[in-house]
Amino acid sequence: MGTPSHELNTTSSGAEVIQKTLEEGLGRRICVAQPVPFVPQVLGVMIGAGVAVLVTAVLILLVVRRLRVQKTPAPEGPRYRFRKRDKVLFYGRKIMRKVSQSTSSLVDTSVSTTSRPRMKKKLKMLNIAKKILRIQKETPTLQRKEPPPSVLEADLTEGDLANSHLPSEVLYMLKNVRVLGHFEKPLFLELCRHMVFQRLGQGDYVFRPGQPDASIYVVQDGLLELCLPGPDGKECVVKEVVPGDSVNSLLSILDVITGHQHPQRTVSARAARDSTVLRLPVEAFSAVFTKYPESLVRVVQIIMVRLQRVTFLALHNYLGLTNELFSHEIQPLRLFPSPGLPTRTSPVRGSKRVVSTSGTEDTSKETSGRPLDSIGAPLPGPAGDPVKPTSLEAPPAPLLSRCISMPVDISGLQGGPRSDFDMAYERGRISVSLQEEASGGPQTASPRELREQPAGACEYSYCEDESATGGCPFGPYQGRQTSSIFEAAKRELAKLMRIEDPSLLNSRVLLHHAKAGTIIARQGDQDVSLHFVLWGCLHVYQRMIDKAEEVCLFVAQPGELVGQLAVLTGEPLIFTLRAQRDCTFLRISKSHFYEIMRAQPSVVLSAAHTVAARMSPFVRQMDFAIDWTAVEAGRALYRQGDRSDCTYIVLNGRLRSVIQRGSGKKELVGEYGRGDLIGVVEALTRQPRATTVHAVRDTELAKLPEGTLGHIKRRYPQVVTRLIHLLSQKILGNLQQLQGPFPGSGLSVPQHSELTNPASNLSTVAILPVCAEVPMMAFTLELQHALQAIGPTLLLNSDVIRALLGASALDSIQEFRLSGWLAQQEDAHRIVLYQTDTSLTPWTVRCLRQADCILIVGLGDQEPTVGQLEQMLENTAVRALKQLVLLHREEGPGPTRTVEWLNMRSWCSGHLHLRCPRRLFSRRSPAKLHELYEKVFSRRADRHSDFSRLARVLTGNTIALVLGGGGARGCSHIGVLKALEEAGVPVDLVGGTSIGSFIGALYAEERSASRTKQRAREWAKSMTSVLEPVLDLTYPVTSMFTGSAFNRSIHRVFQDKQIEDLWLPYFNVTTDITASAMRVHKDGSLWRYVRASMTLSGYLPPLCDPKDGHLLMDGGYINNLPADIARSMGAKTVIAIDVGSQDETDLSTYGDSLSGWWLLWKRLNPWADKVKVPDMAEIQSRLAYVSCVRQLEVVKSSSYCEYLRPSIDCFKTMDFGKFDQIYDVGYQYGKAVFGGWTRGEVIEKMLTDRRSTDLNESRRADILAFPSSGFTDLAEIVSRIEPPTSYVSDGCADGEESDCLTEYEEDAGPDCSRDEGGSPEGASPSTASEVEEEKSTLRQRRFLPQETPSSVADA
């Protein structure tokens, strides 16, 4: 190979090697020093040695002098002797002095004068080192915490059999007897004595048609099938009864108790396999009620409540059935026959059945304004005391109640044990004043007064003392003595109600005469009465689901009672009473009826029997099939992958839905509250359960089995239309809630639990203080005041409970009674606030057990800390979601260190900052505090206050503001914000993209459009600078600019603010180009994520996420108007402002190929026709924004979004110098739009609670969207009916079967009819939804095309 040059180089000097290396690496020459002569080298060595000797001599001299000073003898002084204790004290003081000096230097207190210069030097050197090394104090970041197992996991034990010492039959019976309420131990043991075992072989019948229906059957082991006969004589299995469940009918139990027992007609139950059944005869209850008569009223009341809530809720509210639920074959009682009057009780065939509520009825068009006469029989009392005029039509309830403490006031019952009748009294929502109790009754009326009522009606009242000489002035009784008519009517009423002492009716009954067209009571009225028809008839109407029309349920004839169901249950009236022609009736108020029941409890049986007699045979069948189910806290209702065989309706309590991913990770999907429909999509589509649903707290549900639904579809095919509506509403709701334009791809929102706000549709809220310094009473009163503007609110604390229910109310023996009483209060109020004690008392435990959500309240100006009560709470499995609420003084600084508050706690679902009025922090005694808030409650709550914002969050009425991206055009956001403030629209949540994230962050920090405008104008002015961008230019590998100048401009605005420290909840959107996904930022450094959301490709480099290092770009590429994100965070209404550029859509068609020279000629030639063809840059831009455009179309067509777009198309993206012009355009546009909203009452509807306006519709979509299908497929799924079992029933007589299965003939009633197919005649076409009706005509938006469902026959 020869001698290479490489070998020669190895022998070269080291200087030459270094020279060559540096020349190759740096690309420039390095001059190497030449070798020096020998003589100068020797001279240098000599000079160095001399210097070293000189330094050594100096050091030796200094050491010698120091030693001489130490050897100098000191003058001897007196030598002292010390005792041991003095030495200990001396050295002890010396040590303590040293310790005090060291600690004082640590806390920067007064130190000695000698140490101060040292400390200053140390600090100065430390600062210099920080500047050199650029050491910065890192701001704390929010720690990612997963929800605890108690939130995401249900209990593994599904029953109490393994953990209980009681036998299974006792537990099963206890569980199923609870359907009739809680029985004390002696009552339950008395019932268990009547329990009988019954063993059945496969195919054996438990009962068959024709046999007595007088028992409750509980399955201990095996399987029972509940069957109903079909049209072809075959039996259809409508329900399978597993061990632990029961077969019973509340109406049948009521018939036995009231003494009107009937045999089974159509229902049968047989054993699907060998089974053991426990039978409890209903006669056992009669024996118990003989010993404990007060329990009778309570049990009957519970039966009525569950009949109304379970049966009517499922069949009417969700399946749309109306007059199919009531019988029309009741024979009227002729009390005062009048010739020529019809006696029919059912609607007339061929007459109009549907009445429009928007217009006037045919029969009442001319008589609606006629007066209403009534002759009253007042209660005796002191002479001369006038009675207040009463009106048949109750006035609407006030919007704001001044009740601060418990509104139920029952005189004489406080402080003592609660009896069953007391519970029934409160269930009926009766309030008895102390004055009435003391005086023996209400005050009497003055003789013969005629008063004008507010509704335009007249009341004629008189005293019984003068009635002997007075005659009846109206109706068929003209000329007869009023007293004789009144006494005869009272005798008939006493006979009907089986009142042993007729004097109980004295002073408690009013005689009324209503002119034709008068509305006696309206649907939804709370203050109801009992009406006993004497002459004429009362028509009972009910509002149809999703239509502004009413349907006639039945006609009450003479001798019938109306309104007894609402009187017994205490629930609002479920129908409207209207006198279509002149009618005379007796009226007993609810309070008077309960006074009669207190004197004679058996009266409740007669009233309940009249309700049961009105129920149709179909309702009796459904009473067997539809179950009332109770689920204890922590127990799973069903698990993911289970078979979908039923649908549930939440009656009381709260459920949580959790999904388990393929990786095994569990995530929170949503929560369900009162009135929500669960599992309907899975049940109708025959899909396995998509998630696991467990109870957050003790929950009651109505269970609608799959077989029962199939039977209803066979009997009433019009139900299919309603099911199609329900199912399409659920699926459409899921489609609207899909985040991102490509569901299932990486461009959609990751389904994390923090991206949803399950704290909505709450019924109960527990309030827990962090420390004793939190003004809990004032805070709860402020929150109650804000909630009262939304709906009835109740505040409970331990003092209120003891005052109302007695000192022993919190004892364990009273647990079931207290639970029942609290459940009543939750039913009667929109939301109940539970104020805990400052320690872990039994009341605190009860509050946490009852809570749907727990608010942890702390003081924002204190050091972040965890309270002792919270630490105790961590050791218990609390399933309710927790939210942190920090209170701040009105004039104090803004929020800080929120991250530290959150990091030291376990998982919280969210946090809120509240700016509180001064009165909340004032120190007052409880009496003075209540006196102060009495005045506060007399005023309406400010909708812009932070407590009103918290109230909207808790009730699910949050209003979100979403600001889109568009460069300088985003300055118009501030003008719209100013107009929004002037219109009085509150904002509870702010989000945005690009420039929208910048403006939104300013508004979330300032909460004032004026201050937001001032700070945004300063920043826009800096954006017009030319020098800074020029200095920021760089070599364009990734971007044209380094981003440093833009970073400084954003940092100057927000400093080191954290997103968690903003006043309003805030989020923004970025595009993660590392993971090809959309990122939603709700915590972290504010300026960084705002900058990331404003990062345009090519101009600025992507921002590195400080959390995971992912590269973040402008969120406008994927979601320029993130209204769907705000919706997923719990917003009811989203106001979305779009300022993006409008792309040209009218492009030229140039054929299959395109020549660039041709385009150049077209552009240069002034006489050629201009062509519109995008260049390469525009094509790339359009490709980048494809998903954004599609997402925008989805947002614009959604029902929850108020889409706004100012006229800003004439401004360019970088026109920041035209800030004031763009602001004025937005302001003028906002004034015009919000002015139209004010005139159209859109704002008021926006602030109205959705539970009060949308009672008939489910508020929550089901858990997961199933594969999309066409409308024909949807109809096929819903209308699919399983063939009945091939078993021919031979135990039901033809006549008996026809009584229940044949459609009734409508032969009476002036305005009710039904066509052959069962669908209503004359029904108007389905109108748009209520949400669409609220939209302002000034909005610019695009609607989804409405699809018309096919006919029921086609389905």
Curated annotation (Swiss-Prot):
Region spans: Disordered: 338-395, 1286-1355
Matching CDD domains: CAP_ED (cd00038), Pat_PNPLA6_PNPLA7 (cd07225)
Record: residues binding a nucleoside 3',5'-cyclic phosphate 1: 179-306
Keyword Transmembrane helix: yes
Entry membrane topology: Single-pass type III membrane protein
Biased composition (Polar residues): 343-361
pH-activity relationship: Optimum pH is 8.5.
Regulation: Inhibited by a series a OPs such as mipafox (MPX), phenyl saligenin phosphate (PSP), phenyl dipentyl phosphinate (PDPP), diisopropyl fluorophosphate and paraoxon.
Mutant lacking the gene: phenotype: Embryonically lethal. At 9 dpc, embryos are smaller, and their development is delayed. At 10-11 dpc, the development is arrested with signs of resorption. Heterozygous mice have lower catalytic activity towards the synthetic compound phenyl valerate in the brain and show increased motor activity.
Motif DGA/G mapped to chain: 1114-1116
PTM field: Glycosylated.
PANTHER family: NEUROPATHY TARGET ESTERASE/SWISS CHEESE D.MELANOGASTER, PATATIN-LIKE PHOSPHOLIPASE DOMAIN-CONTAINING PROTEIN 6
Protein name (record): Patatin-like phospholipase domain-containing protein 6
Organism: Mus musculus (Mouse)
Lineage: Eukaryota, Metazoa, Chordata, Craniata, Vertebrata
Protein encoded by which gene: Pnpla6
